[in-house]
Amino acid sequence: MLDDNLAGRTISIFDEYLSYGPEAVEEVERMMNERGFSISLPKDDPHKAALVLFGEIFGAQISGTSYDSTMKLMIAVGVSLLVLMREKRESRAISFENIIMTKNDGTRLLPVIVNIDEPELHLHPYLQRALLAFCRSILNNKESFFLKLVQNLLGVDGLDGQLFVVTHSTDALVNDYRKIIRMYRDEKEMVRAACGSSFHFDSEIEKHLIMHFPEVKEALYSRCTILVEGETEYGSFGYFAKTLGVQFDYHGICLINARGESSISKIAELIRRFHIPAVCLYDRDVMGSRHHSSYVFYTDYICFEMDVVKSCLSHGKRKLLDDVIGD
């Protein structure tokens, strides 16, 4: 909900842009309709057109699909950003021209930093991702209509934008570890930052980590991680822990399926770079090819499944195995 001052400034911006002529009105109308709206703006009255546009974007939605409400939210956020940038242009606290960056080719860019705090408080996962992607598009000059608004209303060629998101949601995290900063406390309880852009891996490992990162990014919120090779370990470890009276969530333990022994060491190294302890479990058949190190363990027999079978047999639980096979 906009307060009266922000609403007035928003309408003023619409009014100014639509005053460029019928072509501008038609352009706005076309842009809105391409995004799922059904809107017709007066061509000969810019102020009335501005009021209609404002009501369409910021008014209560009585009917429509979830796509309609998503588009309304994203456009409303984009317009709000534009209002704030326009306020910076009109401010006398600092000359707007002193803020502008001019590239060697003469391109004029407005540096903008946008911070979004805890989007998960009000948005479900799909809206989190949609809104953040839309903001990135605006800041990277990929939204053609908003780019035109920036050019006409601010007198610059585009934006040089950065987006900072403070979140405890995996949905709001980008799927690229190089764009993540994790805050943590060191052994002296001092607050430190681990920045993914400062990590250096060779190109093949980097590609591998980026490909797997969407599956492991939950670990960034954990206190410790356990990495296992495959589906069997991943499916059973949680139940083993409960049998032992250990709740992973209570202790902040994240169980990760590395989907292959070759991925374990790579993912563990990435997690440790973010200053999160990582425990690794391998099948014994790869033990000879690996260096022994702390927090790396191997099954007693050639593979995890054999460990389970041997343990059941040694404890007289053959019937349990027969029942599993029967299922």
Predicted regions and their residues:
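Extended helical coiled-coil dimerization/tether regions that scaffold
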Residues: 1-118
